[in-house]
Each structure stands twice: as C-alpha cells, then as structure tokens.
Amino acid sequence: MAAPDISSLHQGQPLRAAGSPLAEAAGALILIHGRGATAESILELADFLPQPGLAYLAPQAANYAWYPYSFLEPLERNEPYLSSALARVGEVVARVEAAGIAPERIVLGGFSQGACLAAEFVARNARRYGGLLAFSGGLIGPSGTPRDYTGALDGTPVLLGCSDVDPHIPLARVEETAAVLAR
C-alpha cells in the first residue's frame, strides 16, 4: 500500500512570527496551537514572554486542527493528518536550524492538541532541545501504544502542565508522557 500523500494537508499553511527576526535570533520558541485555535492566537504568548534575541514561530494547522480525533485514538485513525502535522513541525525546526540556531536553543511548546503534537514530535525526534513546554497534552495514541522511540533527549528541560481532573487528558497519560520523556 502506498504511503498517503501528506503534502496537501498542513504543508503550505502559514508560519507566523514575532520577536527577533530568525536570521538575527539567538534562539527560537516554536508555539503549536490547539484544536480550533490559530497560529496568531498562540503567538500572542510572545507578548507575555518577551525575551530579547528570541524568535517566536507558530505554524497554522489546516482547518484549525492538526488531526481529526482525540489524541487517545489509535494512531491510524488520525492519519494521514498526524504524519502531516509531525512533518510540518519538522519543517519549522529545520528552518530554524538552517538559520543557524542549534537544537539546544530551540524550545517547542504547545497547548492541548498542540501540546500533544509537540510532545510526540520531541519523542520521535529525540535529541537535546532547548526545552519542551506541553500544557494540557501528552503522547499520542491509546493506552498500550509502543513507546520505543530511538534517541535520547540528553537533559532537555521538559515542563508538562495539566489539571488532574481534565476531562480530555487523563492524568495517567501525562504521567506516562513524563516517564517516556525522562528515559
């Protein structure tokens, strides 16, 4: 079976920016919005987190969602959207690196669906990053999904934030995410 064509999903969507121009920045914060939100809305965080020399980048999901179903659904159910979303984040990271910013100076952050996508991207592309900020999210897939990711985060700072009574994000998934990312 041929791989699904992901080029028409999230690729080509806008990439919003704030802060220092990428070519002049010493570091980057990639912000990933949640379902129903926009790149512009999450980029507003830059106003509350001003850091000289930091480029803030926010990719836009097609139709305001990175994938159609809950992050707890089987991975196949969210395809090909999930693969496209992960590829889009990878494109943004590559763009930042091409501007001369080392991975250790790149922080990925997200809220809700964006937090899930940021955590999944970092887990699948493990290396030393500047950090991971995941608010109200966790690794993608149902309970029992193999988490045999290769690589190591090598001391990447990770902040996972979530209510212990969130109706959409089980505390156990946040704890599992923390354990996987700590390996």
Report residues per predicted region.
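Acidic catalytic loop of the alpha/beta-hydrolase fold
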Residues: 36, 141, 164-170
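Short beta-strand/loop motif that positions the catalytic acidic residue
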Residues: 154, 159-162, 166
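Hydrolases whose catalytic domains are alpha/beta-hydrolase-1, hotdog thioesterase
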Residues: 117-121, 143
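Gly/Ala-rich beta-loop-alpha elbow adjacent to hydrolase catalytic centers
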Residues: 109-114, 118
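Active-site signature of alpha/beta-hydrolase-fold catalytic machinery across serine-
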Residues: 44, 120-124
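Short alpha-helix in the alpha/beta-hydrolase fold that links the catalytic acid
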Residues: 42-45, 145-146, 170-180
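Serine-hydrolase catalytic machinery in alpha/beta-hydrolase-like enzymes
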Residues: 2-105
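A conserved short beta-strand
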Residues: 127-140
